[in-house]
């Protein structure tokens, strides 16, 4: 009887250990990686909020990797490869430079790990994404061109804060912007890339206003640059006289528009992009069909006239939220 009890206890302990091991494995299997060039600022914070908020609802643990800036491409590639080694269920990726990610994305595909673009329709220049949620960067450029023509119907001069050097999203926007203004009376008099930092953008915009005191419009690749341009116009007491045009409507961009120092914003919906991207991951992980492989999230032109009538919940994270 005593031996039987010991055997029963041993079997029970063994079963408990097996259950715990299975539970641990199940928990590990629920991890999803997120690889971003940066995790701070008016673009990355809301997209990460959308991902994180819906990931909790879907039962996933998110591992966020921050490369610390667009200049750290090698670091981002290394972080992505590390997520593959960790055998996460899927990876959400916004690549600093898609040309650098071909090998890493192939590595993920070989490991049967889906790679989904989050804020980027492209994950690697030669390897297709399993899915993506984004706005077309070329479409943003076209919409910015519409904005420039609306603000300067008779033509004028433009100084361009072009975005981070080497960032494909910024170059795509600017390329398509230039295509649309090529045969107009709009003339680009200055163009400069710079670090994606508000203080750097402000300094660059101030420099433009000093070098080109009669410039008609400042173009910002996104609202980090646009807010810098707006604050420069504000400091020079040129709000309204120098038009300010950019993409993405974060909190600071909204404030600068209310102050009359930003005139036209092509607003993206990064919270919605994040929610859509993690939803696509969930379907891929569960082997369910996607409605579309690429979900293009609509752009919303914003001026002071419609600023109060549009919902910001798909554009901005809750105040104080950080990744």
Question: Which ranges hold each PLM region?
Answer:
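Bacterial N-terminal signal peptides that target proteins for export
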Residues: 2-14
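Sec/Tat signal peptide C-region and signal peptidase I cleavage site
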Residues: 22-28
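Hinge/cleft segment of the Venus flytrap/periplasmic-binding protein
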Residues: 30, 161, 165, 181, ...
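Extracytoplasmic "Venus flytrap"
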Residues: 31-54, 58, 63-80, 86-88, ...
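Hydrophobic alpha-helical segments within soluble ligand-binding/sensing domains
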Residues: 32, 74-76, 132-158, 200-202, ...
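Short, solvent-exposed amphipathic alpha-helices that sit
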Residues: 43-60, 140-144, 168-187, 200, ...
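Flexible loop/hinge segments that line or gate small-molecule binding clefts
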Residues: 61, 99-139, 150, 157, ...
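Hydrophobic alpha-helical
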Residues: 81, 93-109, 177, 190, ...
